[in-house]
Amino acid sequence: MASEKDLLKASPNGREMLKDGRAPKAGEIMKNPTMGNTFKLLAKHGKKGFYEGEVAEQLVKVVQDLGGYLTLDDLKHHAETGTEPVDPISLKYTGQGVGERPDGGIELWEHPPNGQGIVALMALGIIQELEKQKKIPKWSLKDHNSTQYLHTVIEALRIAFCDAHWFVTDPNVVKVPSAELISESYLAERAKLFDQKKAISAPVHGSPAHLQSDTVYFCCSDPEGNAISFINSNYGGFGTAIIPKGCGFTLQNRGANFSLDKDHPNVLAPRKRPYHTIIPGLTTYINDGSLHSVYGVMGGFMQPQGHVQVLLNQEVFKLNPQAALDSPRFCIGAGMPSADGKMTDATIYLEEGIDEKVVEELRALGHNVKQLDGYGRGMFGRGQIIRRHVDDDVQVWSGGSDLRGDGAAVPL
């Protein structure tokens, strides 16, 4: 109902994405012919069919009619810079005995800033450094979702988010030191913040975890070992809920992730890209660089947290792709910062299925814990995995699709 009202309120074209002016009921067939026309234009003209021509004209018109500032020249500029090819960033993970395997371990590849994939890389690197510093033991299978395991991964992600909150922005406008942030020396230094006996007391410069998102992730592979990891999102719910007339889609609201602090690298500015949450993931084997998996976890700021948890579930705790996704997860949430930049609240959300004793022990370590069940579990994201391995020179594929969502793993 909330989304229905948002669509009708946001622009005069809200009925285009509703059925007779209302949200479709369960089981009803919903048609969106105007979106079909937009897809035809994209198929014929590529991205020019979106950033130029009738779609672009309607997009600019609805924004200007509602008092916004957008021109056709802005869209043309974004088509050139906002869709440019980028080089991925990566981190080799060999911790917890993973590097002792014949394949040498795995390398996780993420989209670089302005995306938040660097959070997953930093967190994995910090966990790896903690093991080298002998601050954490080598985990056994029974340690999965134990108090010490969850405390370690939670704290590593909190440290990583602290840095990302400051550094992640548009690299075409402000230099982002990605290589330095995931360097072994820097991560070893950051790992020194970890305390086995209590949660870090320093403020965590995270961002609020969104209970709703309008994200779609899919992955696919072929028999030759080629694969695609793809993600797209309008951000919160239906984004702005503003619909360009005759186009069948809503405009995104990614600008919500800019900072309004004039001294912040991610400060709002014209023709600048904000901190971005959507991140497709891909892993390769270290020894030969061949494909290990393609995967992703939809869900706003849950995404790098999901990447880390799902990857560790497979590599350290030997879970298959479906079991790795089914396993209960945690999500670090955060209140908005106060005027002095300190966080007013930092909550660790735990999914039903995590042992009650573990919940209480995490509270004793100083974590502000809240348990979620039912529909609240949507906070923990919705993931998809395609996994490849070679057994006796035979290529074997497996897949998993998150029970929290409505996807499927389908062999063709």
Each PLM stretch: what is its role?
Residues G53, E57-K61, S140-F161, P321-C331:
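Short, well-structured alpha-helical segments that form the helix of a local strand-helix-strand
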Residues H45, G49-E52, E57, G125-E129, ...:
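Alpha-helical support elements that line or immediately flank enzyme active sites
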Residues F161-D163, D170-V173, R271-K272, H307, ...:
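Extended C-terminal subregions enriched in glycine
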Residues M1-E52, A56-I106, P112-G115:
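Noncatalytic scaffold domains of N-terminal-nucleophile
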Residues G21, G68, E129-N234, C247, ...:
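Internal maturation/activation junctions in enzymes
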Residues Y69-K76, S221, N226-S293, Q303-P304, ...:
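Active-site rim segments in enzyme catalytic domains, especially the processed small/beta chain
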Residues R101, I106-I118, Y285-Q303:
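Extended C-terminal regions of large enzymes
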Residues P85, Q212-T215, H276-I278:
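Short, small/polar residue-rich loop motifs at catalytic or cofactor-binding pockets
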